[in-house]
Swiss-Prot record:
Physiological role: Involved in chemotaxis. Part of a chemotaxis signal transduction system that modulates chemotaxis in response to various stimuli. Catalyzes the demethylation of specific methylglutamate residues introduced into the chemoreceptors (methyl-accepting chemotaxis proteins or MCP) by CheR. Also mediates the irreversible deamidation of specific glutamine residues to glutamic acid.
Annotated coiled-coil segments of the chain: none
Cellular localisation: Cytoplasm
Protein name: Protein-glutamate methylesterase/protein-glutamine glutaminase
Annotated SUPFAM superfamilies: CheY-like (SSF52172), Methylesterase CheB, C-terminal domain (SSF52738)
InterPro entries (alphabetical): CheB-like, CheB_C, CheY-like_superfamily, Sig_transdc_resp-reg_Me-estase, Sig_transdc_resp-reg_receiver
Family named by the database record: Belongs to the CheB family.
Species for this entry: Escherichia coli O6:K15:H31 (strain 536 / UPEC)
Domain CheB-type methylesterase residues, every copy: 152-344
GO cellular component assignments: cytoplasm
């Protein structure tokens, strides 16, 4: 099998050296070239035709976002962004994902060499995922048409959503058309700390419903979406007649925290047939067992189809496990989940 050919663009000579060490330490990939800025990278891309580009967000001569926008228009290819953990860094990274980057890694704030080498396996995994990702599914999405407001639903009704690679844009596409009459939504997207708040704030500006990073103990309200905070699990709990959110530092599940399975299992237990479960694009199997538990508890469950997924890993695993009632294109997810929750459709298996 041929190796994954990687080109790294970073203005830091140290970062270029570290990325080269990391990539070349894995037998299934090789660093074919490095560039100090996008202008040099442009020529190297033509020369080496890499499978994956790693791209620093902030660089002289042309910043990473400008370059990414031009690249995706003229020569689309899988890109993994390398970002700082600053507030500005998280906003720029989310913009990069919107423009077509597949994923991102964050630079440690201290001890760059030790920190990056500790991330070696994670970086390699993201490069492998990017090499296999569907670029056709990751072209910038148009703004979906707002759905008509439906009848006000019981506050017992809610929707649980799980996603990973490619999920930030898929979630935007699902939430943006939702009317204020929508039920509450609980969302777990695999993301490091420092990014989930920026992600929620960005969605809150774009959506009619309220979107926020979830907080421990807060009451779950219709017309609101709650995003699991980075590196914390989110569960649905009860407080008397109301739903509330539980945030905790339990061990990683399926190598993830937050984990989609943790959310889905709690929703199966607390909401049962009053819930709809949705699994979107992502690598791995997180959410498959939890979605089966939701279906067995009477919830209606949807999976995003392969054609519209950046990575058809998590939906495929959920389908194979038998936890999915219906497979739909991303463009139909919002409409279908609202139709099912409004109809109170549920099926026991």
């Amino acid at each position: 099998m041929s190796k994954i050919r990687v080109l790294s663009v970073d203005d830091s000579a140290l970062m270029r050296q570290i990325m080269t060490e990391i990539i070349n330490s894995h037998s299934d990939m090789e660093m074919v070239a490095t560039a100090p800025d996008p202008l040099v990278a442009r020529d190297l891309i033509k020369k080496f035709n890499p499978d994956v580009l790693t791209l620093d967000v902030e660089m002289p001569r042309m910043d990473g976002l400008d370059f990414l926008e031009k690249l995706m228009r003229l020569r689309p290819m899988p890109v993994v962004m390398v970002s700082s953990l600053t507030g500005k860094g998280s906003e720029v990274t989310l913009r990069a994902l919107e423009l077509g980057a597949i994923d991102f890694v964050t630079k440690p704030q201290l001890g760059i060499r030790e920190g990056m080498l500790a991330y070696s396996e994670m970086i390699a995994e993201k490069v492998r995922t990017a090499a296999k990702a569907s670029l056709a599914a990751h072209k910038p999405l148009s703004v979906p048409t707002t759905l008509k407001a439906g009848p006000l639903l019981s506050s017992e009704k809610l929707i649980a959503i799980g996603a990973s690679t490619g999920g930030t844009e898929a979630i935007r596409h699902v939430l943006q058309p939702l009317p204020l009459s929508s039920p509450a939504l609980l969302i777990t997207q695999h993301m490091p700390p420092g990014f989930t708040r920026s992600f929620a704030d960005r969605l809150n500006k774009l959506c009619q419903i309220g979107v926020k990073e979830a907080e421990d103990g807060e009451r779950v309200l219709p017309g609101h979406a709650y995003i699991a905070p980075g590196d914390r699990h989110m569960e649905l709990a009860r407080s008397g007649a109301n739903y509330q959110i539980k945030i905790h530092d339990g061990p990683a599940v399926n190598r993830h925290r937050p984990s989609v399975d943790v959310l889905f299992h709690s929703v199966a237990k607390q909401a049962g047939r009053n819930a709809v479960g949705v699994i979107l694009t992502g690598m791995g199997n997180d959410g498959a067992a939890g979605m089966l538990a939701m279906r067995q508890a009477g919830a209606w469950t949807l999976a995003q189809n392969e054609a519209s997924c950046v990575v058809f890993g998590m939906p495929r695993e959920a389908i194979n496990m038998g936890g999915v009632c219906e497979v739909v294109d991303l463009s139909q997810v919002s409409q279908q989940m609202l139709a099912k929750i409004s109809a109170g459709q549920a099926i026991r298996i």
